[in-house]
Amino acid sequence: MHLSMGGLLPGLALLASANALALALPLESSVYTVQVTNPFHESLFSCPAASWPKVKLGSENRSQEPSKDLKKILSQISPKRIEATIRKLVSFGTRHTLSTQTNATYGIGAARDWIESEFQRYANASDGRLTVAVVGYDQQPDGRRIPFPVRISDVVATLKGEGDPERVYLVSGHYDSRNSDALDYKGIAPGANDDASGVAVSLELARVMSQRGLPRPKATIVFAAVAGEEQGLYGATFLAQSYRNSSANIEGMFTNDIIGSSTADDGTREPHVVRLFAQGIPPLNVEDQAMRERRIMIGGDNDTPARQLARFVKETAENKHTDMEVSVIYRLDRYLRGGDHRPFLEAGYPAARFTEPNENFAHQHQDIRIDKDPKTGMDIQYGDLPEFCDFDYISRVGKVNAAALWNLAMSPGMPRNVRVNTSDLTNDSKFTWDPPAGGNALVGGYEIVWRSTNAPFWTHKMDVGMVQEATIDLSKDNVIFGIRARGKNGERGVAVLPFP
């Protein structure tokens, strides 16, 4: 199929809307606080960098509006339920991985059993759509944060897809906690933000998405609560390797870790922003040195599977219905920190991490106490307590997750073997691809998307129909291309970078 230039592409207008900022100087403090007062600003999918090359081809790539079913899902995510979940998890005293697993009211075993019972309660009301399992293994001493053998258990709820059930998307939070001493498994460690907040989102999404009044998703969605994160990402590593060993087709994984507060240690509030960390070049065990060199040669280091997944989230989950801005961070994680998305990346799966915009380290990995602030000398409350959580904010982060997961699960999977022809010196670009792993049953057509090489998100698109090759009059030297499938229901999937 050959597509020549034709049709006028409307000029991309840079949206001028910006957050209204209210600056206030509290009388009792000399610290300026910046508060975002505009709850929503429209998504930016164009930028000055995207103005060249100028082409009269295709159309503007716009954000994807939520479907009727997705709007229903978003409307039912409850801050009160999220708060109740977090307070219940805190009530177990500590959820340290090494803590007791036999006490019915204290320790990680009690938390595990309660999480399982909640998932099972939702499963019982789902008419068989949701199934629940506790999976795990016995971890031996590691010479670091596991001094004696301990059982690592993950609680997993699976919403089986209908249409392409072998394609899987997974969302997780970790239910273990810690205080100042990573090996203190007896002391109180409430872990409200880190990471009861993430577990609360997994539970709430399972509740809402599995209800009888909704259609089944096309692909399978897994909701997980994992253990062992604070001791070395053990639960997530076990889960990722279990899926890899069974050759599972996981096309996207999100972990929600520290999503509980929108307020920084200096009082700065950004209640309508969430960070999404997305890795660049994959690990060498996923892409070998030769593949890595090819990626670098074509300028594809910013178009890894994880970053394509993040672009999809930006395009589908940043809107007035979620009331959130998704700030994509082109980095694996924060400095000196790690998260449960990493084992999935190392297993070869696209994965990314949601985290609040500004962290207060007095409320993470701390013994509960009142102590001096090293900056101000004033007494402050230390500890990861529920009183420092913003439950409305957590529910909005949950909506971002829901929008991304539902759109992913209702759209076709990623095209495979996506190639760009470089056999001749030409000023056009020829592409070939194979259908998604699940075949063409859900596919209504394919789209070529592109952006300027220094633009962060897709700015243009062209529908090329139900084909597996296409040539367009736009030089591959000047832009970054992607190929994505469009569903018969109109839902667009994740784009894939073409390799020579």
UniProtKB/Swiss-Prot annotation:
Cofactor binding mode and count: Binds 2 Zn(2+) ions per subunit.
Annotated compartments: Secreted
Transmembrane parts of this sequence: none
Matching CDD domains: FN3, M28_like
PROSITE patterns, A to Z: FN3
This protein's record includes keyword Nucleotide-binding: no
Binding site for Zn(2+) 2: 194, 230
Amino acids binding Zn(2+) 1: 174, 194, 257
Top EC class for this record: hydrolase
Keywords recorded for this protein, A-Z: Glycoprotein, Hydrolase, Metal-binding, Metalloprotease, Protease, Secreted, Signal, Zinc
Signal peptide residues on this chain, from the entry's feature table: 1-24
InterPro entries: FN3_dom, FN3_sf, M28_fam, Peptidase_M28
Main location: secreted
Superkingdom, natural source: Eukaryota
Any single GO BP term: proteolysis
Required co-factors: Zn(2+)
Residues in coiled coil: none
Enzyme Commission code: 3.4.-.-
Gene Ontology annotations for the cellular component aspect, listed alphabetically: extracellular region
Known glycosylation sites: 61, 103, 124, 245, 421, 427
Domain Fibronectin type-III: 414-500
Metal-binding found in the keyword field: yes
GO molecular function ontology, one term from the record: metal ion binding
Protein family membership: Belongs to the peptidase M28 family. M28B subfamily.
Protein name: Probable zinc metalloprotease MGYG_02393
Annotated source species: Arthroderma gypseum (strain ATCC MYA-4604 / CBS 118893)
